[in-house]
């Protein structure tokens, strides 16, 4: 596990974005942990979050031409990632996001920001069922662009309804890499280093054994 990944876990724990306990997911599964990126909700949070996204993106080595943040949660993520790439990695990249509803005045259309062209790096908080990715793909393809990759904060590494995770399905269906700041495996590795969190470690490992990919 990289140092920035450990810092991200501690950041998420400190903001209660990452919590341990018993949580019922939309899938009906009872999860021993919960991740709510919506609680990164201050200016400082967003500034730090962008640095973590930028770090993961640069480390991945994936070539891209524009960042795309799908409405709504992807919008601040794309924005802060673009700022962090420019400020900390000297990479001044264009970014773009979509509106849920088309605007019929001013610049019009459903896209805001840079043109959606070339190789698109899609940034979002998590992938649950892959629905948002499929919606974004229709926008990307309609603009004649191509999906270079997807970057999210956490890969839960768990099966969907079949044998694959939603992320593996996206990689299979669109032929791109999905990268994340951290994975469930990273989280388990972190818990193994924290003796005071041993009770959570057992529950998370049991969950991975049952639902993991």
UniProtKB/Swiss-Prot annotation:
Keywords: Glycosyltransferase, Magnesium, Pyrimidine biosynthesis, Transferase. It catalyses: orotidine 5'-phosphate + diphosphate = orotate + 5-phospho-alpha-D-ribose 1-diphosphate. Its cofactor is Mg(2+). It holds the Pfam family Pribosyltran. 5-phospho-alpha-D-ribose 1-diphosphate binds at residues 26, 72-73, 99-100, 103, 105, 124-132. Pathway: Pyrimidine metabolism; UMP biosynthesis via de novo pathway; UMP from orotate: step 1/2. Its EC number is 2.4.2.10. GO terms for biological process: 'de novo' pyrimidine nucleobase biosynthetic process; 'de novo' UMP biosynthetic process; pyrimidine ribonucleoside biosynthetic process. One of its GO terms (molecular function) is magnesium ion binding. InterPro entries: OPRT, Or_phspho_trans_dom, PRibTrfase_dom, PRTase-like. The keyword Transferase applies. SUPFAM superfamilies: PRTase-like (SSF53271). GO terms for cellular component: cytoplasm. PANTHER family: OROTATE PHOSPHORIBOSYLTRANSFERASE 1-RELATED. Homodimer. Belongs to the purine/pyrimidine phosphoribosyltransferase family. PyrE subfamily. HAMAP family: PyrE (MF_01208). This is Orotate phosphoribosyltransferase. It comes from Edwardsiella ictaluri (strain 93-146). The lineage of its organism: Bacteria, Pseudomonadati, Pseudomonadota, Gammaproteobacteria, Enterobacterales. The gene is pyrE.
């Amino acid at each position: 596990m990289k140092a920035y990944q450990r810092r991200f876990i501690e950041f998420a724990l400190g903001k209660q974005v990452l919590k341990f306990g018993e949580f019922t997911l939309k899938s009906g599964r009872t999860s021993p942990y919960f991740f709510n990126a919506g609680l990164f909700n201050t200016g400082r949070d967003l500034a730090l979050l962008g640095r973590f996204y930028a770090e993961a993106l640069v480390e991945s080595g994936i070539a891209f031409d524009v960042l795309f943040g799908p409405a709504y949660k992807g919008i601040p993520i794309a924005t802060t990632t673009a700022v962090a790439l420019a400020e900390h990695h000297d990479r001044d990249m264009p970014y773009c996001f979509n509106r849920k509803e088309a605007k019929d005045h001013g610049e019009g259309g459903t896209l805001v920001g840079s043109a959606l062209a070339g190789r698109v790096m899609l940034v979002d908080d998590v992938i649950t069922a892959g629905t948002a990715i499929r919606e974004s793909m229709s926008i990307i393809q309609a603009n004649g662009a191509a999906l270079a990759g997807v970057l999210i904060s956490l890969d839960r590494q768990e099966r969907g309804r079949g044998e694959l995770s939603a992320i593996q399905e996206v990689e299979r269906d669109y032929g791109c890499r999905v990268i994340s700041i951290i994975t469930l495996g990273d989280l388990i590795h972190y818990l193994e280093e924290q003796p005071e969190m041993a009770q959570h470690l057992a529950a998370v490992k049991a969950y991975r054994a049952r639902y993991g990919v």
